[in-house]
């Protein structure tokens, strides 16, 4: 049986990245809550190294 977690950075970024959080009101609420709490990384976009 295939495991349920099949990691992919693209899917991870599309679902939980900064841009996708900013798209919805609730996503912006998540960001605000994480800022208020003083999180070092707001979204997974801050963890995944970018090209360039």
Curated annotation (Swiss-Prot):
GO terms for cellular component: ribonucleoprotein complex; ribosome. Residues 1-19, 31-42 have a biased composition (Basic residues). Pfam families: Ribosomal_L34 (PF00468). The keyword Ribosomal protein applies. One of its GO terms (molecular function) is structural constituent of ribosome. Residues 43-52 have a biased composition (Basic and acidic residues). Keywords: Ribonucleoprotein, Ribosomal protein. It comes from the Bacteria. Residues 1-52 are annotated as: Disordered. GO terms for biological process: translation. Belongs to the bacterial ribosomal protein bL34 family. This is Large ribosomal subunit protein bL34. It comes from Cytophaga hutchinsonii (strain ATCC 33406 / DSM 1761 / CIP 103989 / NBRC 15051 / NCIMB 9469 / D465).
